[in-house]
Amino acid sequence: AIRALFARGMPPAPAYAMARRNRFLGRWLAHGEGYPDWNVRLFDRRRARWTEDVVHEHVVAEGPVARLDGDLLHASAESIEDYVAKQNRYTSLQAQALHAKGERASFARMALSPLTRFLRFYVVKAGFLDGAAGFAHVAIGAFASFLKYTKLRGLDARRLEGQTAGVDLTRL
């Protein structure tokens, strides 16, 4: 798809997204949160740029992003231990970013965010069709949502106590 795009000359769109297919527990996911996971990976640096987000940086473009055929294959981690450790790091960074923006985590958000995430990706987006790998992928994602807001709540509590400087969120 990329060669065909450039065979016609300079591509017209400022950026192109590809469907990322995630490999998890030895299986290429075809549903749920694992596919299609659209990501911009081809872009004109004059008309698009990476965000400075601490987690899940993405490309923002001046104009509409076009889609390319084909899959971008992505192995998210070597092992389940690595994947869970990565989620722990990401949720710490996400909680810190939300905390810096002044956001707070209510009990309702801690409880409902993981539930709605699980239902959205396992039921609505048919993650159940990916079997045990799909269940594990969505369940870990839902737990990561819980961790993010629980860590944010921990930061909120420390903010009230005036103790947020240098907090290691991987220990919360």
Which residues does each predicted region cover?
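Catalytic-site signature of metal-activated, phosphate-bearing donor transferases
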Residues: 1-159, 166-172
